Every structure is written in structure tokens, then in C-alpha cells.
Amino acid sequence: MAAVANNKTALTAVINNASALNTVVSSSTAMAAVASSQTAMAAIATSSTAMSAISASTTAINALKASPLLVAKTKSGNNWTTETVRSGRGIAVYIYGASVSGGNGWVKTDNVQTTFSSNGTNQNLLKAFQTSLSVYWYQNSSTLYYIPC
């Protein structure tokens, strides 16, 4: 599977075949290879079909959360702040919103806003972005996890 994950042509063929794509997102071994491949992550970030399949699969979501490519951005300080986390392509995987009374934050992927709860839990995002990833948050130790592509 690693050979397919690192070959853009082969990966595109898998993404364009619903049966093959469903087989991949259902397999922890296949998804581990995909989630470890920069080539695969870049292809997935540009495919709404692939993102939909991943979002519907607990196996695929867990593979992204365990990806060696995953980057964590942690909030420092207790104040409402908007930060641009990344310019360029990637996948916002999940966020930990540390508990705070007084409101929720948001994550923007290509200027599309998704609210997250500041309640001390991990919340899946699974949003691809092509140009930018930003976050509005308050509480120290809140952490946004994403895969740059």
C-alpha cells in the first residue's frame, strides 16, 4: 500500500474508484500508509470525494490522528486571539478546546468557519484547505492538529 500512497497516478485511480477508496479507508494498514505519505495527503486535500470517504470512516479518522505528518499548534496565554496557523494546503484534523466559560472559538479553512466548543474535549474537524488555516481561541493549552501538504 505504501507504493500506491506514494504514487500520485495510482492514488488518483484509487480516489476515483468508489470501491477501491472504501476498501482503503476501511483498512487500518492501508490508512496508516496513506496517512504517512505526503503525496497521499496532498492528493486527499484536493479531493472532496476522498475527504468525504475519510470523514465517514472511524478507521481513516484514527489513522489521520496518528499520522507522523500531524502538526500541533498550541495556544499560549488566556486571551481571545485570532491566529493564522498555516498558509498553503493541508487538512485540519481535530482540535482540543480547553475549558473556558464565555464562548466558543472557531477554525477557518479557506475562510469557511467551523465553530468548536471550548469544553475540554477533542473535536474532529476533517476540513481540507488550499490557501489558509486560522483559528480564533481563548484558553491556554487549546491545541489545533493539522497535516500540512
Locate predicted features:
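Noncatalytic modules at the cell exterior or secretory-pathway interfaces
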Residues: L125-N140
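Beta-rich globular "head" domains
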Residues: P68-K108, Y136-C149
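Serine/threonine-rich low-complexity intrinsically disordered regions
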Residues: N7, S27, S57, S67, ...
